[in-house]
Amino acid sequence: MDKSESTSVGRNRRRRPRRGSRSAPSSADANFRVLSQQLSRLNKTLAAGRPTINHPTFVGSERCRPGYTFTSITLKPPKIDRGSYYGKRLLLPDSVTEYDKKLVSRIQIRVNPLRKFDSTVWVTVRKVPASSDLSVAAISAMFADGASPVLVYQYAASGVQANNKLLYDLLAMRADIGDMRKYAVLVYSKDDALETDELVLHVDIEHQRIPTSGVLPV
């Protein structure tokens, strides 16, 4: 065997461990892919039950009270000038108001900022007289009297402020579905004009079960 053949054989011998070393990562990669797929399936399963801002559950992941369900309505405020106010009475569907004596336990407002939202808003819910025209002056006075909790919602770089819900408890008031027309959601645009494509409010009204609500989520 000449010198060149000896050198070639030596190189081949040195390469064998390298070929073996390449097979080990392939096996590890396969195991990693299997594990990744399992984790992905687990995340999807968990995400399906994880509450988000749009998830149709009352008060995040909390269930309704026994014997209760909820009806949701969506409000989209019109343009509100800087320092001005907006009010909208709670108008439930006829299929719900038909059972006007069913008790209401609580109202929750969930603030859903849209892509263009860059403002600061104050949100509350109040019982207002039937004679009230929800004028700017009337709404301003209701924000100032401190008689109702107020949610201050500000722009967040993440897209959703950590606290985006306001809960209004009505158990002690013995309010019923028929009373809901006496309540209104009020919005104050503090620092900037609120445009029509910046904000949506989801209002969840928890009330005693009615025959037509059997298919609603609880």
From Swiss-Prot:
Gene3D superfamilies found in the cross-reference section: Cucumovirus coat protein, subunit A
PTM sites of type N-acetylmethionine: M1
GO molecular function: RNA binding; structural molecule activity
Keywords: Acetylation, Capsid protein, Ribonucleoprotein, RNA-binding, T=3 icosahedral capsid protein, Viral nucleoprotein, Virion
Function: Capsid protein. Probably binds RNA and plays a role in packaging.
InterPro entries for this protein: Cucumovirus_coat, Cucumovirus_coat_Asu_sf
Top-rank taxon: Viruses
Family: Belongs to the cucumovirus capsid protein family.
Region Disordered: start-end pairs: 1-28
GO cellular component, one term: viral nucleocapsid
Compartments, record wording: Virion
Any matching Pfam family: Cucumo_coat
Keyword RNA-binding: yes
Ranges of biased composition (kind: Basic residues): 11-21
Domain remarks: The N-terminal arginine-rich stretch does not seem to be the major RNA-binding region that allows formation of an infectious ribonucleoprotein complex.
Entry protein name: Capsid protein
